[in-house]
Amino acid sequence: MLQRTLAKSISVTGVGLHSGERVALTLHPAPENSGISFRRTDLDGEMGEQIKLTPYLINDTRLSSTIVTDKGVRVGTIEHIMSALSAYGIDNALIELNAPEIPIMDGSSLPFIYLLQDAGVVDQKAQKRFLKILKPVEIKEAGKWVRFTPYDGFKVTLTIEFDHPVFNRSSPTFEIDFAGKSYIDEIARARTFGFMHEVEMMRAHNLGLGGNLNNAIVIDDTDVLNPEGLRYPDEFVRHKILDAIGDLYIVGHPIVGAFEGYKSGHAINNALLRAVLADETAYDRVEFADSDDLPDAFHELNIRTCG
């Protein structure tokens, strides 16, 4: 299977969920083997240089996955766009933005899916590389845990736990095996969510300044405040899977393995990536030149190109 990038550049505008700032974002094609990079067009000189994404640049995980470079350049809330890039198997892209945060759009990854559909996807000449999990790797922190296990495909299983009546109406656990299920149908529409009682605390820390009922599910003491209700009965846990897929794609390759989590979040997801990369016996970087060898979970990627 070959690496892929966008067929053309494409732009969108929106608002940062936490910064509240208006953002203009452009996705560009990028050369093979260049990976996913970001560039702040509102910054000059070294501060405005391209940032090649790696798990080691995720240095702020308060409510999102945020790049913080050693020069202090920030690119916040990257998990939703990374989740969409993962769904389309985009290996190489440059993402330019003129503010410190990716726009939240409607709180899901679906607007970014539409953006990628409009741009189109093309194969490149180099072979796509996958990160294959070779042995179990687990992180446990304060009653939470995440783990990778070997698996011939890509499967995600997550369980959430919130002491609130709205979460008792659906299963706290969701599992999706991408060999038989579609990311776009099952995951992409799930929106981020938050609680009314947390708004004052968040805004005191300059977080959630752009949040509203158009880009998040808002929950009061008893119910969902959004008049349209939920997009899935179990939208909350599905959104956590959307986040996890984006967090995991920060490693730069599709993952051949199973990911499981209990009360997972951005910090522990990133810690798991770092733990895997720190143990050379835990993973291998593999290629599938023959499509017959490609795990079924990735076959759908073969139909999402326009060249």
From Swiss-Prot:
Catalytic reaction equation(s): a UDP-3-O-[(3R)-3-hydroxyacyl]-N-acetyl-alpha-D-glucosamine + H2O = a UDP-3-O-[(3R)-3-hydroxyacyl]-alpha-D-glucosamine + acetate
Gene3D superfamilies, per database record: lpxc deacetylase, domain 1, lpxc deacetylase, domain 2
CC cofactor: Zn(2+)
Entry keyword annotation includes Lipid metabolism: yes
Signal peptide residue numbers: none
Pathway: Glycolipid biosynthesis; lipid IV(A) biosynthesis; lipid IV(A) from (3R)-3-hydroxytetradecanoyl-[acyl-carrier-protein] and UDP-N-acetyl-alpha-D-glucosamine: step 2/6
Binding site for Zn(2+): 80, 239, 243
Pfam families linked: LpxC (PF03331)
Keyword Transcription belongs to the record: no
Gene Ontology biological process terms in this record: lipid A biosynthetic process
GO molecular function annotation: metal ion binding; UDP-3-O-acyl-N-acetylglucosamine deacetylase activity
Enzyme class, spelled out: hydrolase
InterPro entries: Ribosomal_Su5_D2-typ_SF, UDP-acyl_GlcNac_deAcase, UDP-acyl_GlcNac_deAcase_C, UDP-acyl_N-AcGlcN_deAcase_N
Active-site annotation: 266
Keyword terms: Hydrolase, Lipid A biosynthesis, Lipid biosynthesis, Lipid metabolism, Metal-binding, Zinc
GO cellular component, as recorded: membrane
Enzyme Commission number: 3.5.1.108
Protein origin, superkingdom: Bacteria
Record-stated family: Belongs to the LpxC family.
Record protein name field: UDP-3-O-acyl-N-acetylglucosamine deacetylase
Source organism of this protein record: Neisseria meningitidis serogroup B (strain ATCC BAA-335 / MC58)
